[in-house]
Amino acid sequence: MIEKGAEISGKRRGRNNAANSKSLGTNVNGSNSWEEGSSSSSSDDEPGGGGMRVGLQYQAVVPEFDQEVAKNCQERENLGMLVWSPNQNISEAKLDEYISVAKEKHGYNMEQALGMLFWHKHNIEKSLADLLNFTPFPDEWTVEDRVLFEQAFSFHGKTFHRIQQMLPDKSIASLVKFYYSWKKTRSKTSVMDRHARKQKREREGSGDEIEETNGANPVDIEIEQPKEAKKEVPKNDTVPHIKKEKHPSQAKNRAKRKPPNGMFLSQEDVEAVSANANAATTVLRQLDMELVSIKRQIQNIKQTNSAFKEKLQGGIEDYRIQEVSQKFNARWTTEEQLLAVQAIRMYGRDFQAISDVIGNKSVVQVKNFFVNYRRRFNIDQVLQEWEAEHGKTEENGDCTEKAVKLPETAIKMSDEEEEASLLDITYPSAS
């Protein structure tokens, strides 16, 4: 790690100890040349910036390991909190499945999912149940942030305080860190740096162009050439004399960036936002708050749907009204007799439907009622009315049926009903 104090002391040592340069050899001379290059390049960028620090004077002095110092450091109160520690009891397959569910279903990233698992002491069931209770913090760099960074970089180059105006929720340290990770995904010839210098030269003029190229890194201004066209550069020719304008059409096509589908960014909107720092901060903060609010709504809807799905997994049997299981009763009350006649008027000879209407009488008992109480309630006339409305069917071909009597279902009737049934029973004629 390069410390700031060591860097400052290294600068002073490189400038003031010119008389003692023999002991350092060519390293000190090389470091002085790098200092000159960094000072010239920092004139174009922000104050405090510079080139690469190369040389012995820029290296940190690593002290010897001291157990007492290490012990005192571990006993500090402001130590960081451990968020994940692997456990041998959890297999890799289960861990991958847990992370996949946390990512796809709940929107967690890997670090957040593992932190939740570590909080519950590597209990996957408890962790999965607790994932619904929290809304994961959104990713630090979303797709929208990356597109805005590319657009801001195309306008302002490596002037990070201007880029911050378009991304007010990002610190300059975060912008610089993302810039170097983003830079690695681009061409090795540093197309971004060349594009940034081209934009700055167009704004500041040719005078600043010479000043910038003198302090730039030779690796950054190297242009892409075919392998057969590459030749060694003579010592007298300096790299800054190489011009980038040899392929203007290719540079224009290379500089074009298209945002993802569904996103657009007009130059008028960017200029309006960049005109005033306060206005840009307010507008972007409102948009960011709306985005976070929408994400929270989506997460709440997901949690609600998941809760409903869990409730429906057991089926609807728990919510179904339990039907009172009524036992069949052999006695016919007055209300049941009238209800049976009305059911015959409505359903005809559909004994099953009549049994369902009455509730506590079986199909056999309904058939017995049909035969026993035929004359008493004038059931034949009721059937004729039903047939007049619905027509005569195959089921209604016979007007009489014998009562079904089973020994195990023998019916004990009251004296009154038994006497009435004996008088009313009729048997079909021999014809």
UniProtKB/Swiss-Prot annotation:
Transmembrane segments: none annotated. One of its GO terms (cellular component) is histone deacetylase complex. This is REST corepressor 1. Residues 29-42 have a biased composition (Low complexity). It comes from Xenopus laevis (African clawed frog). Residues 1-10, 224-242 have a biased composition (Basic and acidic residues). Residues 1-53, 190-262 are annotated as: Disordered. Pfam families: ELM2, Myb_DNA-binding, REST_helical. PANTHER family: REST COREPRESSOR 1, REST COREPRESSOR COREST PROTEIN-RELATED. The lineage of its organism: Eukaryota, Metazoa, Chordata, Craniata, Vertebrata. The keyword Nucleus applies.
